[in-house]
Regions:
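N-terminal beta-alpha lobe that positions the nucleotide/phosphoryl donor
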Residues: 1-146
Length: 146
């Protein structure tokens, strides 16, 4: 039986923590990296490292097209986004799932709902959870907003 392969769509300490967990679960960790991270510890500790190119995050860690190619090229079974970069991007989560790859994180609908303050407040209120008081609809005037 072949080991499951997890592509970690992040860098640095975040990626290192995920790599450690992936290996404890007896799976293969795939790091991704840009020009500036070529010698980073997360690249060295992973079972495999995939070069994304570029030095800016927009060219690498935030580039959905580039990350989707990495998923295909490495034959990853799962994707862990870490946090930041594309971890809260519903479109990235959808693209990963559409490809038939397991997304390790909230489903795209949850990501979208929790990214909208009013929608997330409505969901929390509906669930009966305690939260900071606030509006359940957008302000229409300056007076309503203050």
């Amino acid at each position: 039986m072949t080991k499951k392969r997890v592509l970690i769509a992040n860098r640095g300490e975040i990626a290192l923590r995920i790599i450690r967990s992936v290996k404890e679960l007896d799976m293969e960790a795939i790091a991704v990296y840009s020009d500036v991270d070529a010698d980073s510890l997360h690249v060295k500790r992973a079972d495999e490292a995939y070069y994304l190119g570029g030095s800016l995050p927009s060219e690498s860690y935030r580039n959905i097209k580039t990350l989707m190619k990495a998923i295909t090229d490495t034959k990853a079974d799962m994707v862990h986004p870490g946090y930041g970069f594309l971890a809260e991007n519903a479109d990235f989560a959808k693209a990963v799932q559409k490809k038939g790859v397991i997304w390790i994180g909230p489903n795209p609908e949850t990501i979208k709902s929790m990214g909208d303050k009013i929608e997330s407040r409505k969901l929390i209120s509906k669930a009966g959870l305690k939260h900071v008081p606030g509006q359940l609809k957008p302000s229409r005037t300056k007076r309503e907003a203050t």
